[in-house]
Amino acid sequence: MAKSYTDDDVLVIIEKCNINNTNKQYKKTVKLIKPLLSSYNFNDINLKILILDGYLQALIELDLIEDIYNVTQELIQLDPLSKNSNNNKYFILAQIIGGKKGIDLYLNGINNITNSDKIIECYLSIVDIYMTDLCFEVDAEQQCELYLNKSLELNSQNFMVYSYLGSFKISQQSFGNALEFFKKSWSLFNENLGSIDMDKSKILQYCYNLIKFLLELGDLSLIDSILSYSKQLEDDNIEGLYLEGFYNYLSLKMKLFNINNNVDINYSYTPDQFMENEMNVHILNYNI
């Protein structure tokens, strides 16, 4: 027999769930809310919004994607202006769905916020979609430029925007410009280090992505400093160790290639030289 609940019971559950989530006891939150949602008929829609909002927080931490998908959809229907729930529901669902529907969700969510850093984050996520899911759309390139420019208009000193600009320029095969944007990104990152509000995992991913792009362009000049900083955050990260190994491998390959071609051992190539005529392939295939 299903348990019966009163409005007072619901209020108590909301309070308990807030405590559970604060203490990172997310499974307890799910255990409290699941039976409530299956048997209680909410007369007060705001109570349901509060319940679903707390439930969503726990589901995200437990990575229960199917439930996250269903709850975010319901929350958007019940509270489209995010008056009583976290507006991130739009962006979470957008990440799950992707494509044109994902872009619509990002834009709808942006309408509810004024924080420029968060808006830029959403614009860059839209650029991501156009560079992946929608890369074959006829206007994909124009849309990328549009949202990158919108991001710069909001904050021309945002280091992540320049990282995305570099990636976009690689897709256009404008390799020299790409390198300049990556250098600008790393410079801005260091200049604003004290005020950057990002999770350690996101900062590490930024560092690792930047290293990958620089390796792709054959420019090793910044990689030591990026690796040094990332090691301060986490010195035994598998991805970081792999990238450091590949960096040393490529550096040695380039030196041997230079020696074999009677060029100064430390000669460095421009991105255009490195990518031209598959020189990068010749260097990587050179026997040690």
Stretches with model-predicted labels:
Residues 1-50:
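N-terminal leader/linker segments that initiate helical-solenoid repeat arrays
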Residues 2-3, 37-48, 74-86, 110-120, ...:
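Flexible helix-coil transition and linker loops at the boundaries of alpha-helical arrays
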Residues 8-14, 47-53, 57, 83-101, ...:
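Amphipathic alpha-helical repeat scaffolds of TPR domains
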Residues 25, 179-288:
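Structured C-terminal portions of repeat-based eukaryotic scaffold domains
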Residues 27, 31-34, 73, 107-111, ...:
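Alpha-solenoid helical repeat scaffolds
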Residues 30-80, 86, 90-93:
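General structural concept
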